[in-house]
């Protein structure tokens, strides 16, 4: 057994209280062994002046879209996708996707993210980047059948199911998978209905965009005579362990369906604001017992992957949407970014206690914007920045130490991504 002892810090407990304690983790099993007065570890990690919190979880992301950061802005979702994003994505190579994913993972890890839900293409390349970086992930192939004939549409679903089967459990269990049809309006419903039972047989959950904009909701209501999540239920898409992204335009019946079925929501406030998609009813989700996680969405619609910043956005816009300053309170948001996100992605993490996965972020409290320290839970929700994360630990392994990623050469990753981004845009624009 090889152990890591995190010493000298304060610890955020599962009850969201703070106490001074050491944390001992088993780097071989990847679990926390003890919190408190622990035995000495084989190696130590200094947390003096820091708060040890559960690793943050980004429940919905398209990490490789770092290559398109700043490429197309200030448009509503449908125009943004059809005029800008989909045409350039048609030119993506597997090498582009790996380079963009590696850049995204460096950004995530430096901001204290230990697990990510990622929907994109060329999933073996994404999984390889995940294995190299040392992060944890729930991955899937984004299935889009718009504009494809029946054979190509079916092939896209077959690819989505195949990679879910083949890659589940990769990277020593850090990679888990899901079947990921893009949405109810971009993936053929008949094929969804056909492939859902096959995904269930394979033991993988299902993740998709749902109720993101009124342009998505209204056609389903008009054509099907039911709300989108009622239609999703008819297709078999609402089962325990499944999770949706966005859930902006939902009614009470749909919220009740999510709660009854045990389906989580990846709440992406910054992307929803930037694309003017709307404000998700987060307090209503919480009141109904729906598990809520925090997501950044892709870095082309955010435009960063900072879950710390996303917590603040979620709290602020949640209060605005509810017209209630007490709504979406700091403890709710901290829980969503940690335990709620871990539950949404299906990882036994999100809490600093014995038996949980040793996925941790160590936040440096020595900053003017974190002084004084009346309430550290409040600080996590409203004042902490991603750059305040000093160390990131995944499965008892130190991945970021003193703000430097140990598993990837960040400088080389940035240079490689810059080159791939330039070449991608040049191909797409015919230069």
Swiss-Prot record:
Catalysed reaction equations from the record: S-adenosyl-L-homocysteine + H2O + H(+) = S-inosyl-L-homocysteine + NH4(+); S-methyl-5'-thioadenosine + H2O + H(+) = S-methyl-5'-thioinosine + NH4(+)
Enzyme Commission number(s) of this protein: 3.5.4.28, 3.5.4.31
Cofactor note: Binds 1 zinc ion per subunit.
Gene3D superfamilies assigned: Metal-dependent hydrolases, Urease, subunit C, domain 1
GO molecular function list: 5'-methylthioadenosine deaminase activity; metal ion binding; S-adenosylhomocysteine deaminase activity
Residues annotated as transmembrane: none
Domain of life, source organism: Archaea
Residues reported in the UniProt entry to bind substrate: 89, 182, 212, 297
Keyword set includes Plastid: no
Pfam families (UniProt xref): Amidohydro_1
Signal peptide: none
CDD domains xrefs: ATZ_TRZ_like
Keywords: Hydrolase, Metal-binding, Zinc
Function: Catalyzes the deamination of 5-methylthioadenosine and S-adenosyl-L-homocysteine into 5-methylthioinosine and S-inosyl-L-homocysteine, respectively. Is also able to deaminate adenosine.
Family: Belongs to the metallo-dependent hydrolases superfamily. MTA/SAH deaminase family.
Protein name per its UniProtKB record: 5-methylthioadenosine/S-adenosylhomocysteine deaminase
Native species: Natronomonas pharaonis (strain ATCC 35678 / DSM 2160 / CIP 103997 / JCM 8858 / NBRC 14720 / NCIMB 2260 / Gabara) (Halobacterium pharaonis)
Lineage: Archaea, Methanobacteriati, Methanobacteriota, Stenosarchaea group, Halobacteria
